[in-house]
Amino acid sequence: MADKKGSNSEKLLYCSFCGKSQHEVKKLIAGPSVFICDECIDLCNEIIRDEAAAAGVEASLSRSDLPSPQEIRDILDQYVIGQERAKKILAVAVYNHYKRLKHLDKKDDVELSKSNILLIGPTGSGKTLLAQTLARLLNVPFVIADATTLTEAGYVGEDVENIIQKLLQNCNYEVDKAQRGIVYIDEIDKISRKSDNPSITRDVSGEGVQQALLKLVEGTMASVPPQGGRKHPNQDFIQVDTTNILFICGGAFDGLEKVITDRTEKTGIGFGATVKSKQERDAGEVLRETEPEDLIKFGLIPELIGRLPVVATLGKLDEAALMKILVEPKNALVKQYHKLFAMERVELEIRPGALQAVARKAIRRKTGARGLRSIIEQALLDVMYELPAMKGVSKVIIDENVIDGDGKPLLIYEDTPKVAGSN
């Protein structure tokens, strides 16, 4: 753009892109016979960021960036204790899924099908944590849905397409990103068919939801209201293709081991058959023998089982595993409480006997790893309440008696030790 003269005869410079003068913008940068203002630079950066984000969906999952199954397993090991076989199965399944996505555009005679995952294991065994860790590792959108809140479309409750709406919300409504995300559907066992016999009453939260989930899991164009609104006629919908979304379904499947045991005991008959007694086989060992027919008998419809070809079973966590969970993972509970107390400039010591008592209590409550935090929180409540107002406390010691409710934390002052709550 040609230079123009101002009324005071000074030579004004103008942006070659938007035409604004040097007085209308904060900064004007000169190039060979051209100028660009700071506003145009910001606009260019915004365009580049948007294009890079769209391209990043492809680039982030390219072969060079995709971790190998062993690398995925190593990262899972940092957050999840035990469940070695389940971690190996998940690592291979997730690697193959995103490797498949990379080759979607390539024309080939062999079309690779999606392999969704079914996790079977007791409460607190690490099902949800495994799915969360995978999503964080791969840097893809992730959402957890509770199957018990879902109903068929037209009934009170959430319909299955709400799951995709939440996934979109998690990635700021970037459809390309959402279409390569991970959905974890928890409590899938709670929507099992109520009985083998068809009923005249509609099973809107059982088999009906399974039928509704079927299309979503297999791959369909889901219609989602924009920006989290409710569905109503004459409204534009966001179309999301679920074909390449990885679905991981999880559930405790209480009673499934009995179905498996009944089947295996019937087949384990005759000379040379080795049949272990029920006492010799723990639930985890029994669940490893899960077959599609067992899941059908439990109440899942055959079509849904067919869409969940990868089955990983998780065992019940024993005392040793729970103690490791308390101290070993990157974000272990004991490390978290150490940090909380360090913020008060106080050292926290949880003795091995206390860790063992926490693990024993979680096993008695049948809450698995999920119940560990509430046990520690309960034991530390009084001292965390009193500590901010106390002066001179340098250390807090927690032993087995504190966890069992038979004692109080020992407070070490800069001069003498004292028991919490005593004056």
Swiss-Prot record:
Stretches assigned to the ClpX-type ZB domain: 3-56
Cross-referenced Gene3D superfamilies: 1.10.8.60, ClpX chaperone, C4-type zinc finger domain, P-loop containing nucleotide triphosphate hydrolases
Gene Ontology CC: HslUV protease complex
Annotated binding of ATP, by residue: P122, T123, G124, S125, G126, K127, T128, L129
Annotated keywords: ATP-binding, Chaperone, Metal-binding, Nucleotide-binding, Zinc
Pfam families attached to this UniProt entry: AAA_2, ClpB_D2-small, zf-C4_ClpX
Transmembrane spans: none
SUPFAM superfamilies: Glucocorticoid receptor-like (DNA-binding domain) (SSF57716), P-loop containing nucleoside triphosphate hydrolases (SSF52540)
Domain of life: Bacteria
Cross-referenced CDD domains: RecA-like_ClpX
GO molecular function: ATP binding; ATP hydrolysis activity; ATP-dependent protein folding chaperone; protein dimerization activity; unfolded protein binding; zinc ion binding
Subunit-level organization: Component of the ClpX-ClpP complex. Forms a hexameric ring that, in the presence of ATP, binds to fourteen ClpP subunits assembled into a disk-like structure with a central cavity, resembling the structure of eukaryotic proteasomes.
Entry similarity comment: Belongs to the ClpX chaperone family.
Stored HAMAP family: ClpX
Function: ATP-dependent specificity component of the Clp protease. It directs the protease to specific substrates. Can perform chaperone functions in the absence of ClpP.
Protein name from the UniProt record: ATP-dependent Clp protease ATP-binding subunit ClpX
Organism of this sequence: Burkholderia ambifaria (strain MC40-6)
